[in-house]
């Protein structure tokens, strides 16, 4: 057992892209009835149990997400948990920012719905190959699985 990891608090930045602030309102059959605020509470509760420090960021604006990631590039031993939403399929800018971040840090991609079982255009994923792990189609539980994965590293 690695005793050192029990004393080290990990810093995780949870980034959510467009329309995720509408969880519990939009497309409940795809995304479930959990609201965005409930998701934040759920993740914070699990993080507290695991002694993980969490910072949340959500934006519907691509450039704001890029700026947020760029501001994290020089932070060492941090993780990003990202659900880029629709930007998964379209944003080279977010991919480039994540790729720079990944040179010194780790990334877990989360998608609430199974993007591989949806419309053809959603099967394009511009970020999965630069992420350490992808958790897809597990509902909001995917965020908890991301924390558990990070905690095991």
PLM region spans:
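Short glycine-rich anion-binding loops that position phosphate/pyrophosphate groups of nucleotides
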Residues: 18-20, 85-88, 113-115
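Short, glycine-/small-residue-rich phosphate/pyrophosphate-handling segment
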Residues: 103, 116-153
């Amino acid at each position: 057992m690695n005793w050192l990891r029990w004393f080290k608090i990990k810093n995780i930045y949870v980034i959510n892209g467009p329309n995720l602030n509408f969880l519990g309102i939009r497309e409940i059959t795809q995304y479930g009835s959990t609201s965005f605020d409930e998701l934040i509470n759920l993740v914070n509760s699990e993080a507290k149990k695991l002694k993980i420090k969490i910072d949340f960021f959500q934006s519907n604006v691509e450039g704001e997400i890029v700026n947020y990631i760029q501001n994290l590039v020089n932070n060492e031993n941090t993780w990003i948990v990202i659900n880029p939403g629709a930007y998964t399929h379209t944003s080279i800018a977010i991919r480039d920012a994540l790729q720079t971040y990944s040179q010194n840090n780790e990334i877990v991609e989360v998608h609430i719905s199974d993007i591989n079982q949806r419309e053809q255009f959603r099967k394009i994923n511009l970020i999965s190959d630069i992420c350490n792990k992808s958790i897809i189609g597990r509902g909001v539980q995917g965020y908890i699985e991301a924390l558990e994965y990070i905690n095991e590293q």
